[in-house]
Amino acid sequence: MSQANAATKASSDVFFNASLEDIDPEIFGAIRNELGRQRHEIELIASENIVSRAVLEAQGSILTNKYAEGYPGKRYYGGCQYVDVVEELAIERAKKLFGAEFANVQPNSGSQMNQAVFLALLQPGDTFMGLDLNSGGHLTHGSPVNMSGKWFNVVSYGVRKDDHLLDMDEVARLARENKPKLILAGGTAYSRIWDWKRFREIADEVGACLMVDMAHIAGLVAGGQHPSPVPHAHVCTTTTHKSLRGPRGGMILTNDADIAKKINSAVFPGLQGGPLMHVIAGKAVAFAEALKPEFKLYAKNVVDNARALAEELKSHGLDIVSGGTDNHLMLVDLRPKNATGKRAEAALGRANITCNKNGIPFDPEKPFVASGVRLGTPAGTTRGFGVAEFKEIGSLIAEVLDGLKVANSDEGNAAVEQAVKEKVIALTGRFPMYGYQG
């Protein structure tokens, strides 16, 4: 073997066999530190969850090497016979999980899945209705700073001021007055049951298409803990993470063959090129997990834990927007503790409790300050936390907020936060995750 060939072989051996730790210790160190954070902190961000080891393996597989523009059986590249199997499994499992006739599993994110529906069903300048961001909607539901708010005429509906529940009379009135081409139901910070049947009745009355974004509650729908929108909506979108417990990505479901054709064309070639086959593999694995009987118990536990957390927080003098929760999340109004969302998020973070500041309906504060925090139970439930643990977590949150009220500063109350942090580490230590060192 020549010297040049020997050097090439040695380089190839390193390329295919050296570990991440050997090749890039900086990235390895950041990942190791993030694993430590996830292991030792209580994750209460409602849009986050923890995937299984099997999903991690699928998403970190050699499928990342493969381009597969198009759809199974109709690719623009050769060598797709095995990734076709992967995508077909993901599609069939998604259809079975949600009782849908058609599924597109290629969207790379929640924003892109919603953009694909708009591309398929709307023209620039068309009118659509969506839940106002301040009432619990999403940026892609018509926010002025988002493409959805820039390209279309958006009519927003909201919640009532007295009880923070959806005002369906207002939805009907706005629909009759504005004759939207599409009505979008669903949100990111609404803790009550959605009346899909009523939304469909309103849509039919004005000749609109009903789109449901069930990104936050898809796992609860799959687990039988929230009514399914699939029988009522013309088209449904959902992310595949959050309560569904899969990799980060999106999916579109429909029972309408004509809409399915438009959706497929909108996703590819309209919006995306080659799909992320390693992510689609992770989606397929997560769907298989969600089809198992134990996932129904998981979904029930998520809701039971959320209700327990909400009641515990109320017992400590905090207000829960709409008075409680029917799903996996809640908005906590911090004004009884004279706190802002910004201060509370930082103080809880120092105590190893992770959440996000969030505006509440009719919030007097700016979005980056906010009067509330949003809390969710999917990740903690995945770790094995039950009602007892979430009651303890509620008490720990109140302890931090009471300390913050006494300190009345951005620096918080170091003594209280350290004491709570030690309790959090003790709690999380009883519920280990993954077998890696961290």
From Swiss-Prot:
Pathway: One-carbon metabolism; tetrahydrofolate interconversion; Amino-acid biosynthesis; glycine biosynthesis; glycine from L-serine: step 1/1. Pfam families: SHMT. CDD domains: SHMT. It comes from the Bacteria. PROSITE patterns: SHMT (PS00096). (6S)-5,6,7,8-tetrahydrofolate binds at residues 133, 137-139. Keywords: Amino-acid biosynthesis, Cytoplasm, One-carbon metabolism, Pyridoxal phosphate, Transferase. Its cofactor is pyridoxal 5'-phosphate. It catalyses: (6R)-5,10-methylene-5,6,7,8-tetrahydrofolate + glycine + H2O = (6S)-5,6,7,8-tetrahydrofolate + L-serine. The modification N6-(pyridoxal phosphate)lysine is found at residue 242. GO terms for molecular function: glycine hydroxymethyltransferase activity; pyridoxal phosphate binding. One of its GO terms (cellular component) is cytosol. InterPro entries: PyrdxlP-dep_Trfase, PyrdxlP-dep_Trfase_major, PyrdxlP-dep_Trfase_small, Ser_HO-MeTrfase, Ser_HO-MeTrfase-like, Ser_HO-MeTrfase_PLP_BS, SHMT-like_dom. Its EC number is 2.1.2.1. The keyword Amino-acid biosynthesis applies. It is found in: Cytoplasm. GO terms for biological process: glycine biosynthetic process from serine; tetrahydrofolate interconversion. Homodimer. Catalyzes the reversible interconversion of serine and glycine with tetrahydrofolate (THF) serving as the one-carbon carrier. This reaction serves as the major source of one-carbon groups required for the biosynthesis of purines, thymidylate, methionine, and other important biomolecules. Also exhibits THF-independent aldolase activity toward beta-hydroxyamino acids, producing glycine and aldehydes, via a retro-aldol mechanism. This is Serine hydroxymethyltransferase.
